Amino acid sequence: MRKLFTSESVTEGHPDKICDQISDAVLDAILDKDPNGRVACETAVTTGMVMVMGEISTKCYVDIPKLVRETIRGIGYDRAKYGFDCETCSVITSIDEQSVDIAMGVDEALESKKGEMDKLDAVGAGDQGMMFGFATNETKEYMPMPIEMAHKLSRRLSEVRKNGTLPYLRPDGKTQVTVEYENGKPVRIDAIVISTQHGPEIYLEQIEKDIKEHVIKVIVPSELLDENTKYFINPTGRFVVGGPQGDSGLTGRKIIVDTYGGYGRHGGGAFSGKDPTKVDRSAAYAARWVAKNLVAAGVADKLEIQLAYAIGVAKPVSISVDTFGTGKMTDEEIVSIVNKVFDLRPGAIIRDLDLRRPIYKQVAAYGHFGRTDIDVPWERLDKVEEIKKHI
């Protein structure tokens, strides 16, 4: 049976991704000085303006406007002709402390109040909600091919802009990849869409030629392309006005880009700007860690795990697994292995993945999962042998 599946990615200069990176830059700066700081930082950008808001409880001081300008400069918006300039944009901040009602549930979990606890039971989940983790062995990164390929193309767009290969490119851009599957396995790429911001002096014909030569051919294995593969490069014909001048942006608007490109489910909670007591982030990272190690151990070819939490309660209220018919054992048996090998209380996740560190801005663009260019703890295959003992 054949089917097509499509996923998209965006570059670091996309307005929503600018916001994610600013929010995580603030988080990293606080965790660097105060590992126990509580952060929920949201950012909005529009023409000539950045607004940073949220709830932050910390003992340290960070210069938020300076962080904002440094982040925007690093992305590449460093001159007025780009329509957004790190030096001249206004930066507005509105920061409150974390609600005492939320803090009391995180500081002392329900298990602690009832006296049924060890030390890790003392940290309650920062919110209710459900989080999903996913892994598949169809790529070496244990990620679905459509999102993995889209991210690589987006990263390459930024690379050729910054290293001067294509100096007329500007920071904003999007990619989209359609993969054809046969009997559940990726066999070819059916379509590639790339929209990249550019200077007004360049013509579409040159952009199409350069993107095929310096981006697509460098990233996509030739065996996945054929004479029927379709290419759509700047299909509107012109993309000069971009970034916050073209569209306003908000933190948390690219949650599917951040995860599995729609191939796996999403619980709805965004990641960026949130410290690890927020299970939206830490439990989603843990779920990916669990799923990847299970697939690498040979438990299934494809696996999705759902975790669910109640605010102020340490232990997950539910854990469920779906192997889509690829499991080497029942889903119930896999859940039993998960409970034996992994401790999924928020305090244990923070400990085991060492999450109270400034490691978040680096994943705020080009995906939080499947990253081989950086070392992030939830991508480590450190539980495979222990899982195999229970198979």
UniProtKB/Swiss-Prot annotation:
Record bears the keyword Nucleotide-binding: yes
GO BP annotations listed: one-carbon metabolic process; S-adenosylmethionine biosynthetic process
A GO term, aspect molecular function: methionine adenosyltransferase activity
Source superkingdom: Bacteria
Top-level class of the enzyme under EC nomenclature: transferase
Keyword tags: ATP-binding, Cytoplasm, Magnesium, Metal-binding, Nucleotide-binding, One-carbon metabolism, Potassium, Transferase
Pfam annotation, one family: S-AdoMet_synt_C
Positions contributing to L-methionine binding: 55, 98, 247, 278
Enzyme nomenclature, EC number: 2.5.1.6
Catalytic activity: L-methionine + ATP + H2O = S-adenosyl-L-methionine + phosphate + diphosphate
Pathway where this protein functions: Amino-acid biosynthesis; S-adenosyl-L-methionine biosynthesis; S-adenosyl-L-methionine from L-methionine: step 1/1
Keyword Lipoprotein: no
Positions annotated to bind ATP: 14, 172-174, 238-239, 247, 253-254, 270, 274
Sequence positions that bind K(+): 42
CDD domains with a match to the protein in the record: S-AdoMet_synt
A GO cellular component annotation in the UniProt record: cytoplasm
Cofactor comment text: Binds 2 divalent ions per subunit.
Cofactor: Mg(2+); K(+)
Free-text function comment from the UniProt entry: Catalyzes the formation of S-adenosylmethionine (AdoMet) from methionine and ATP. The overall synthetic reaction is composed of two sequential steps, AdoMet formation and the subsequent tripolyphosphate hydrolysis which occurs prior to release of AdoMet from the enzyme.
NCBIfam families per record: metK (TIGR01034)
HAMAP family, A to Z: S_AdoMet_synth1
Identification of the protein by name: S-adenosylmethionine synthase
Source lineage: Bacteria, Bacillati, Bacillota, Clostridia, Eubacteriales
Gene that specifies this protein: metK
